[in-house]
Amino acid sequence: MAIARTGVYVDDYLEYASTFPAELQRLLNTVRELDERSQSLINQTRQQTKYCLGLASQSSKKGNGNHYNNGGLDEEETIEKMRKEIESSQENALSLCTEKVLLARQAYDLIDSHVKRLDEDLNNFAEDLKQEGKIPPDEPSVLPPLPIVPKAEKRKSFYGTPQPKKIDYRDRDWDRDRDFELMPPPGSNRKDLMPIEEQPIDPNEPTYCVCHQVSFGDMIACDNENCQGGEWFHYTCVGLTPETRFKGKWYCPTCRLLPQSH
């Protein structure tokens, strides 16, 4: 009976996962395409900014050395036109990066759903083995899980989160807010997923923060790339709220004690 049921579980899962490789490949290819396009825009704005600053410097020298500014109006018009082009390119690049993050979240959720389905089938198969006396009744219902997310994974990974609030990029401190809106903490929407009945917490689920718990709710990332204090931190654990969150460089309690954080 157990052997027959094994075949059923395998066939069902293979059918369920039949479109998985193509879907994942499509998402990753799109992410790569968006990354190339956004990087091209970033390089373009970098060159435009450099040229614009050089033009402004030359205009300033001409103004200081002469009582008249020959061609100054043309240079100002050129600088203003280029400034608008730079702003437009930045907005387009930011839009592409946001789309890239959303696709990366979809890819993670896709992988996560297949892993959960596999865990569920393994649990059901283990229960069948118990009923047939193939394994002891007190054997854990979950078979040893395969590692999904390496614990050494760094904080800048993209994972699924609830839908972010609409961002007004012109009024925000991009360097700080990108950690909140575009680079949310790993797996923070898992509280919304229905867990498999009676399944214990996956021991491979990464833990963060000073509380050493899994990610959930609003979290903030430490700006120390080599953070050893938890990498991502729940607002409540570090005394933050969405209204009082820190703008600028933010370091966790552990990294604040390091010299380079000052």
Swiss-Prot record:
Which residues are in coiled coils?
none
Q: What Gene3D superfamilies does the record point to?
A: 6.10.140.1740, Zinc/RING finger domain, C3HC4 (zinc finger)
Annotated GO MF terms: histone H3K4me3 reader activity; zinc ion binding
Q: Give residue numbers for the site Histone H3K4me3 binding.
A: Y208, M219, D223, W232
Sites where the protein binds Zn(2+) 1: C209, C211, H234, C237
Give positions of the PHD-type zinc fingers: 206-258
Q: Which domain of life is it from?
A: Eukaryota
Q: Which PROSITE patterns match?
A: ZF_PHD_2
Binding-site list for Zn(2+) 2:
C222, C227, C252, C255
Q: Which InterPro entries match?
A: ING_fam (IPR028651), ING_N_histone-binding (IPR024610), Znf_FYVE_PHD (IPR011011), Znf_PHD (IPR001965), Znf_PHD-finger (IPR019787), Znf_RING/FYVE/PHD (IPR013083)
Report the locations given in the UniProt record.
Nucleus
Q: What does this protein do?
A: Histone-binding component that specifically recognizes H3 tails trimethylated on 'Lys-4' (H3K4me3), which mark transcription start sites of virtually all active genes.
Q: Which family does it belong to?
A: Belongs to the ING family.
What is the name of this protein? PHD finger protein ING2
